[in-house]
Amino acid sequence: MNKQTAHYHLPGLFEFYELYRIFLPLFREHREYFYDGCDIGSIYGAPPDCIWGGGRVSLEDHDAGEVLALLQEYGISARLTFSNSKLIEEHLSDRKCNELCALFAENTEPENGVIVHSELLLQYLKSHYPQLYLISSTTKVLTDFEALKKETDREDFRYVVPDFRLNKAYEKLNTLTESQKDKVEFLCNECCYFGCKDRKECYEAVSRRNLGEEPDFSCTSPGAEEGYRFSKAMKNPGFISVGDIQKIYLPMGFSNYKIEGRGLGSALVLEFLLYYMTKPEYQLQVREEIYLDNMLDLF
């Protein structure tokens, strides 16, 4: 990948198929609408009822074959979000998750990947689906810089997503080697309370829900009842703006940027695409192209 290019890893592989069905042709046919030096590195997600799933509970679904066909048409990598941290041996035989991995492994141009947390699942995927590259999930909550370094040194992972609270540790981040920097994928637009001490427990609760359990957990962070708001995320100390990417991170040698949003609506994800990828003078045109498509229900 070109290091002077910001590679965005976008949410909603299954959830926002209809949005991407409209957006991707615009991105290809009207490059003048979009910033120079940005592209789509991957789109990630998982269908509902995937017990290997984690990070967020998926509510929307779309046919996996159609999803893959769309991304192949545009040369974009598809990633399965299988970041459940609570898997045990008996879960590895799950038919739906294995069928998805087998389908994604069939397509090698471009390569597809899996976002993973569980070491048990990691070893299983390496053994059964070696065609799929692996991403270390942000659900590991890597807030310790030395732990991040060790994770980037692991040959198992092509990319590593640290906790968003390491985003502004510029001096430490700049000590990483070129190969380590190539692996780091920053989570840009997290809205979670910066001082949250329960982030790992929150992700574990999602993992348990995907396994059919009812964990006794509720978020008590300040402002949690408001839900996700992009305006609030922009005020987060860990927020990475489009200006930060262009003026700080790319010059430092970092190229990969994850945009969260799987559990949100299409309209808000569109705002992310406009903010991070679209030149301000063309944002209204892109928004109109999307809104005026009668096949897309944004709200």
Language model segments and positions:
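Active-site pocket-lining/capping segments in soluble small-molecule metabolic enzymes
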Residues: 1-147, 151, 157-299
